[in-house]
Structure formats: C-alpha cells, structure tokens
Regions:
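Glycine-rich phosphate/pyrophosphate-handling loop used in enzymes and phosphotransfer proteins
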Residues: 1-227, 231-259
Length: 259
C-alpha cells in the first residue's frame, strides 16, 4: 500500500467531520449540503459527470457520447474525427503528425467547466481534486492499457506557483497517487512566460517552444500527460514534443475539460 493512503483517509475523515459538525459544505451546482464535505454532492457528480465517462453499466454506456479518436471531443457527426483533427482534401500529405498521439478528455468546458474551473483555480477550493480524481481513475480503468501508463502532470509556470502557493494539477496528481493502479511520474519542468490563456491560437503554438524541459534520468516508452483543460492543445503538444525528444515512443494526453 502506498504511504500516502493512510494520510489520504485521515484527511477525508477530518474534512467530513468539519463539514458535518462545524461548517457544512454546500454543493456548488445544486446548493444542497454535500455529505462528504466536497464542493459537489454525490448526486451531482453522478448525474452531471459520470454519464460523460460511461461505465460497465448498460444504462450509462448508452448515455456516453461518441468521441473524436484523437482529441476526445464529443462528435456532432458520424465521422471518427472532429473537424479540427481530420485531414481535409486540400491539406498536404506532408502535414506533420501531432506529437501527442491521442488525447482523452472527460467533460465539456462550456457549462460545467465555465462554472467550476474558475472557482477551483481562483478561489482556493482545493478539494476539487478529490472530486475529479475518482472520475479520472474510473476512465483509466475502463480503457485497456490506460491505467498502466505513468501520468505526467503538466508543470505550472514558476511565477504562478510562487504567487498562489499551490497548483491544481499537482493536487490532482497527489489524489490520483492513492490508487495502486496509477503511477505519477513528475519529469517535466517549465520556464516562466506569458500565460497561455492570454494568447491567440497561433501565439499559443509558439509560446511554449523551448520552455518545457525533461528533468528525469529515464523515460518510459509510453506516458500520459495530465492537465485540467484542453483548448487548442498547444500545451500538451509542447510537453509531448519534449517527452519524445527525450526518447518516449508514445505520448497520450488526459484532460478534465475540453473547450
């Protein structure tokens, strides 16, 4: 058993006691008391998030929508790829393949992400990681081979980390480390620069060039990047380029939200 597990359960017990006895935590979606002391209640997690993942349950599987085979966005046509990922007739056959071989995304940013991500990142409600970690674990265990891939947290900007004192992806990685099937592999570092969210799509593609570095002694053949939201995919691409330059053969991406 991982050493972090006992501390994880102690933290959960203390959070439930604090919420139940002193300061009840209200669900940010429905406004009812969250029995686990988390920012979302179990009912909203089950109804708003789990249907996007699917499960072994037939009813949930029928509600899971088809996804793009590359970026994981929900499809609105019968094509296997979304309009951004499929090659058009006019495109050159020499168009380079993405460094990130496939991306798994869980939830739409429009609606759920718009409401919850700013609260998580800007209001210091760090228990969101405890909400999302079981959902990511569920996705990984449903797809053969995913659970065996070491998860590489996308590194934050050092300036952001100094200002906030914490990083939501690192919190998420710590909660995922509780599961014995999952491995966290921290092997990337990032130099300071302009935040991606302030840039256009074209500028995002070049903003991180040379700013993501490999910091480990060894690199596995397959890795999976972990991030909170995918907009243009530029951050994942920059990280994937670095991993492949270090010798990784296949790089996947896993993001909570897609925009």
């Amino acid at each position: 058993m991982k050493r972090i597990v006992p501390l994880y359960y102690v933290k959960n017990v203390l959070r439930k006691c604090y919420s139940g006895l002193l300061c009840p935590q209200l669900c940010l979606l429905c406004g009812k008391v969250s029995e686990a002391g988390l920012p979302l209640c179990s009912h909203c997690i089950q109804t708003e998030f789990e249907p996007y993942i699917g499960s072994d349950d037939l009813e949930h599987l029928c509600r899971a929508e088809p996804r793009c085979k590359h970026c994981g966005k929900i499809l609105i046509s019968e094509h296997e790829y979304c309009t951004c990922c499929r090659r058009t007739d006019g495109e050159s056959a020499e168009k380079p393949r993405p460094a990130c071989d496939r991306i798994f995304t869980l939830f739409p940013y429009i609606g759920l992400g718009q409401k919850l991500l700013p609260v998580w990142k800007n209001n210091n409600i760090r228990t969101f990681s405890t909400v999302f970690a079981p959902l990511i674990h569920s996705l990984c265990t449903q797809h053969p081979g995913l659970a065996s891939l070491p998860l590489v947290p996308v590194p934050p900007r050092p300036k952001k980390l100094r200002e906030k004192g914490w990083d939501q992806i690192e919190d998420l990685a710590k909660d995922l480390a509780v599961y014995p099937e999952l491995t966290i592999y921290r092997c990337l570092k990032r130099q300071d620069g302009i935040p991606q969210k302030k840039l256009s799509k074209a500028d995002r593609a070049v903003n991180l060039q040379g700013k993501i570095t490999f910091s480990a002694k060894a690199v596995p053949e397959k890795l999976m990047l972990l991030d909170d939201v995918m907009t243009t995919g530029a951050t994942l691409e920059a990280c994937a380029h670095t991993l492949k330059a270090a010798g990784c053969k296949e790089v996947f991406g896993l993001c909570l939200f897609f925009d």
